[in-house]
A protein has these predicted regions:
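Short loop/turn motifs that connect adjacent beta-strands in outer-membrane beta-barrel proteins
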Residues: 1, 12-14, 28-44, 68-76, ...
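Glycine/small-residue-rich interface belts in oligomeric ring/scaffold proteins
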Residues: 1-25
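Transmembrane beta-strands of outer-membrane beta-barrel pores
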Residues: 3-11, 46-54, 79-85, 99, ...
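Membrane-embedded beta-strands of outer-membrane beta-barrel proteins
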Residues: 22-26, 61-65, 93-97, 131-133, ...
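Hydrophobic, well-structured mid-protein blocks that either form specific transmembrane helices
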Residues: 51-90
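Alpha-helical membrane segments in multi-pass integral membrane proteins
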Residues: 89-135
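Outer-membrane beta-barrel "beta-signal"
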Residues: 166-178
Length: 178
């Protein structure tokens, strides 16, 4: 299995807010000790996510598959049932991916995710597709350092399930991978 998590902290107009996600996944191949690869599927996993912020906790559970796609560092698809604290429960699909490549002696990485959730009686379907385009300047510090400079492009339709609340943003990015 694996684990992905992050915390965002924002401060605006004197208000301080935090949002986090913790996403542990349990590998059937890892638990069983058996190779369960078939076709492009490398593994099948139990997928969970805890989303939390000011005044809410959402719990997502379901299954995922890790895919073996040429040139991809990783590609996975997760299917969840979402128990939402403040809105009607829904379903979510999350795709995550990374494609490393070189230009001359420089290392680059394109990675990102796509979250799509279903519409329910009190909210619209939403789609958040965020991709980061990064250059590893860290290797000029040491071969193992992963310090990236780049840009992030985020397209978010019906943000927070609000119909017509759409964003299309490009941000500068400095990111360190542990």
């Amino acid at each position: 299995g694996d684990f992905f998590g992050f915390i965002d902290r924002t401060e605006s107009g004197g208000a301080k807010d935090s949002y986090f996600e913790a996403s542990p996944r349990l590998s059937f191949a890892g638990v069983s000790g058996k190779d369960i690869q078939f076709g492009i599927v490398k593994d099948v996993l139990v997928s969970t996510t805890w989303e939390g912020g000011e005044g809410f906790n959402n719990y997502l559970y379901g299954f995922g598959v890790d895919l073996d796609i040429p040139y991809f560092q990783y590609a996975n698809v997760n299917f969840y049932r979402a128990n939402n604290e403040n809105t009607a429960d829904d379903y979510q699909m999350t795709i995550a991916y990374a494609v490393p490549f070189k230009v001359s002696s420089e290392d680059f990485l394109v990675d990102g995710f796509l979250d799509w959730s279903t519409a329910e009686k009190d909210h619209a379907s939403e789609l958040n597709w965020t991709t980061q385009y990064k250059w590893n300047v860290g290797k000029h510090i040491s071969p193992e350092t992963r310090l990236y400079l780049g840009v992030e492009h985020s397209v978010w339709n019906n943000k927070f399930g609000i119909k017509g609340s759409d964003e299309n943003n490009v941000s500068a990015l400095i990111k360190y991978h542990f």
